[in-house]
Amino acid sequence: MERVKQRIIETIIQINRTHTLPAYGLLLVGPAGTGKSQIAYAVARILKLPWTTLDMSSINDTEQLTGSSRIYANAKPGIIMEAFSVAGESSLVFIINELDKATNGKGNGNPADVLLTLLDNLGFTDNYMECMVPTVGVYPIATANDKAQISAPLMSRFAVIELPDYTAEEKKVIFSKFALPKVLKRMSLKEEECVV
């Protein structure tokens, strides 16, 4: 985990020194439960930028991302435009969870293609709004369980940081220091009333 921390610290230092975002985002790859999303949120807090989250495992159609044309009765802006709206500015950390699920579009088009336009820093156009949002201030941080499922063009937009799974001993420490106290408090139990 020290190597992971070092890579992230190097990126943050680079951003703070140059006052510009790198041309690539961060891709945190590792097994479920290794804290990838929490690390992404921590980086956003350290950079003092607003953040928004996009969960690719729930995206079935590109129109969910890009919005639908106003010619349709049920037309609406896409999730990406809504995220910019909620953030209130175009300089933000865009946290893309489950990036490895982006290529599994079951509907109209490939969601990964839409992400490429967002990650190119050339601007993003929503089909409903029909206007381009500048993306120069967008810093993407993505998470994935299996980088083999991510296309080469998408991978080229990220610096990859691999997070190893926790050892059995580390899992015991995490459980006893963090999870167990929360469970005991929720159940109004004392530690001596519980056998672990």
Please give the residue ranges for each predicted region.
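Helical "lid/switch" subdomain of P-loop NTPase nucleotide-binding domains
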Residues: 76-77, 92, 98, 107, ...
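Conserved catalytic/switch belt of AAA+ P-loop NTPases
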Residues: 95-134
